[in-house]
Amino acid sequence: MEPLDDLDLLLLEEDSGAEAVPRMEILQKKADAFFAETVLSRGVDNRYLVLAVETKLNERGAEEKHLLITVSQEGEQEVLCILRNGWSSVPVEPGDIIHIEGDCTSEPWIVDDDFGYFILSPDMLISGTSVASSIRCLRRAVLSETFRVSDTATRQMLIGTILHEVFQKAISESFAPEKLQELALQTLREVRHLKEMYRLNLSQDEVRCEVEEYLPSFSKWADEFMHKGTKAEFPQMHLSLPSDSSDRSSPCNIEVVKSLDIEESIWSPRFGLKGKIDVTVGVKIHRDCKTKYKIMPLELKTGKESNSIEHRGQVILYTLLSQERREDPEAGWLLYLKTGQMYPVPANHLDKRELLKLRNQLAFSLLHRVSRAAAGEEARLLALPQIIEEEKTCKYCSQMGNCALYSRAVEQVHDTSIPEGMRSKIQEGTQHLTRAHLKYFSLWCLMLTLESQSKDTKKSHQSIWLTPASKLEESGNCIGSLVRTEPVKRVCDGHYLHNFQRKNGPMPATNLMAGDRIILSGEERKLFALSKGYVKRIDTAAVTCLLDRNLSTLPETTLFRLDREEKHGDINTPLGNLSKLMENTDSSKRLRELIIDFKEPQFIAYLSSVLPHDAKDTVANILKGLNKPQRQAMKKVLLSKDYTLIVGMPGTGKTTTICALVRILSACGFSVLLTSYTHSAVDNILLKLAKFKIGFLRLGQSHKVHPDIQKFTEEEMCRLRSIASLAHLEELYNSHPVVATTCMGISHPMFSRKTFDFCIVDEASQISQPICLGPLFFSRRFVLVGDHKQLPPLVLNREARALGMSESLFKRLERNESAVVQLTIQYRMNRKIMSLSNKLTYEGKLECGSDRVANAVITLPNLKDVRLEFYADYSDNPWLAGVFEPDNPVCFLNTDKVPAPEQIENGGVSNVTEARLIVFLTSTFIKAGCSPSDIGIIAPYRQQLRTITDLLARSSVGMVEVNTVDKYQGRDKSLILVSFVRSNEDGTLGELLKDWRRLNVAITRAKHKLILLGSVSSLKRFPPLEKLFDHLNAEQLISNLPSREHESLYHILGDCQRD
């Protein structure tokens, strides 16, 4: 089945039936809901489907769980698995996917205290750090995975990061005091660390002094463990390895031979774990006359020397991860950098067993966040693991605020069920919130969680280990069989340029493009997710990637694969914004009042009080270039104390308006934060702004920014200015009153210390409320620009849509009419095309900007030749002459008589007859002299896009853009052809065509000519389309195509379309 796009998923949701299905199918659907690509199998990476779970008492009266499991998709070949001792507490259910470690030579599988491991949902990879943190508090671990951005940066974290890097560099170079000093200074000058110092308002000198306190301990450790003459000189330790014989308790001398890897990234689908090992070291264990060599994980800690259970647990989990790459290290090392004290951490079966049980509990809590409500009942968020009562743990917990908030807003538990010591803390942490605030929080938590569990948003990285590269290449999101071709180049610290070629033959057809984020793995099983980065260049011969690790240490014969890193369903940022909105701060309180409580926005009475005298001439000159509604928008923004909404109807010069607004605000001395959801939307405004010599700073990764804007990026400016001090970085930030970034880029350190006078959010009507919130925390006033009568925020989950997730902040605040100004003069569509949208959507408010715009028609210099051909061959079909007539800007071609039935295949909807007609029309317009670049073809389903694209490729037609409505938002073409696709007798239309906003966008993309193609009888069943047909009929703009008309066009369509 082909991969579904966002819109196909909406269709499939609607068309799914409610018929009774076999039990096996129900269980398989449950498994697919969590991990759709899982293939059941035996072996090292076995995957079993749980068919039934029964709790029993054995002959000794102890509780056991008996699981009926299978590796057959049909539910055959059933096997019994018995969970004994502590494993019986694992929260496993029918429909779960599991992995079992142990001996399966004889049935049943038995997992008990002494043998085997049981992994619940192994394709959910959980970090070792999260599992270790759950030892003390499982609730904290779940909250940290859910509200990740709430774990804010601290001084200790920054010092720890710098010390890690200095140690990691030194172990590969030298621990000599002068070398350590040099490495420390180099590290402190790196821009990424300077940015964190800026965030925390720390001076470079105070950070340097604190870092230097640790350096003597680095040298001391190296002198003890690395630089000795004989093995007897190395420190003695008591290290018992599970494989040791009876002498296991005798002391041994430990020699750290060398560092083999730094920040080694390992993903383990066997154990459902992932992590980065600080340092992977080769160690010699000298015991008596024997020497054993082991490759082991070394974990670095910069805090208090505690040798705590969390620290030791983390090391033990890294020994499990290490088994994916090499033989079991059986132990690891814990090094406290403050003292240079190193502790051995044996990884015995008992410790690994208990940690994997915790991992299972954490996986269960993360996967089961929403109740699967009974039919007719609304979904609801489930309670998190219980609140603990441990004053010290809670006092320093970074998730304390979210813990209290979730308890009050979502769980709404009675005081008696909360530990007594925590009740006052929960009340104290949430007493500033009203019932309406808590309800807003819980509703958006639920909707975001539902959306994150939608099929398309839940695409994790599991295809890397579940699907061979050769198969995944068909989707265009993967390239396999790659080899390195040139020496790796170090671009800057932590970034390495790699070149790859296909081992045999050219690159396959791919959707990967420059700028795409990717994960690089080895083709062999043990080399999953070696590195992350992005595509720098790609063509049919080679691909160049900038990666976060140097892979030159791997053998030259290593085969690699590139997988696109999907970012669908990232709810960390919106949940973080939602959490911030509930904080007890002035900025959050103000936004709660405006957004949740609908406090009336306030305005200043007189423009003279905000317009500086020396800016009046500049502002007047800018206003001269604007029309009346645009000037009204400028005035409304300048007078606002809270917010303004600018409704940018189609073609009304939204980008020009925003550009003028930034220029005026800048002339008045105001600072401006310019944002939107996409990089392209931000850069479109900046491209226009740059022409007016307005200085700005563009935040974000350079490779995602338009080439002409890259010189304005922070990255490029830091490079050109050779910034190596905090003072110079502050100077850069303070010298740019206009800053631009995406809504997802607000975690940048600059925003921790800067508040802007105005924040402008473009495309605000397409942005989900919690995402749109992000930049608003950092401004005194905000301007939302959009049009809620065009595309809303895309929501895939039907329940989330029903609960209101598609309501943007723009739509929510539009009820305060005093804050709204409309742009109604448009410069895109001629009068006839505009009248369609006026009738359907805008109640006659749209008007043409000039007579030239109103009367503009398509230019077809060769139309005379085409007409001669038509009159010779098609005198019986007058519709053909009419449809190409420039003076007929709008035409609906009705296929009812043809007929043109739809096809549903491989989960997608297409209409081959419509596709053939579209290609015929396109080729004829090109013959008549229309440039292919001036033509756009729109269809609501990806299957139809592919059908049209295939037919175009097999014809003589040039490159014509074929895309969904969503991809055309904000853009236009001289000629637009729309294929509605749906044509059936049962009334099925799909969610897409019911959405009047999507229809509005489709009909407002054309400047000079709009051709609509579809079945009137099928489409008119739905109000938006019925309204469209009423208008088209009244204007006599519908042409009924004759029976079997597509066949009569075959000799023009060509043999390629007869298949």
UniProtKB/Swiss-Prot annotation:
Keyword Mitochondrion: yes
EC primary class: hydrolase
Modification after translation (UniProt): Acetylated by EP300, leading to stimulate the 5'-3' endonuclease, the 5'-3' helicase and DNA-dependent ATPase activities, possibly by increasing DNA substrate affinity.
Binding, [4Fe-4S] cluster: 137, 394, 397, 403
A GO term, aspect molecular function: metal ion binding
Reported cofactor(s): [4Fe-4S] cluster
The enzyme's E.C. designation: 3.1.-.-, 3.6.4.12
GO annotation, biological process: base-excision repair; DNA double-strand break processing; DNA replication; DNA replication checkpoint signaling; DNA replication, Okazaki fragment processing; replication fork reversal
Chain residue ranges for the region called Nuclease activity: 82-519
Quaternary assembly: Interacts with BLM and WDHD1.
Annotated family: Belongs to the DNA2/NAM7 helicase family.
Protein's name in the database: DNA replication ATP-dependent helicase/nuclease DNA2
Lineage: Eukaryota, Metazoa, Chordata, Craniata, Vertebrata
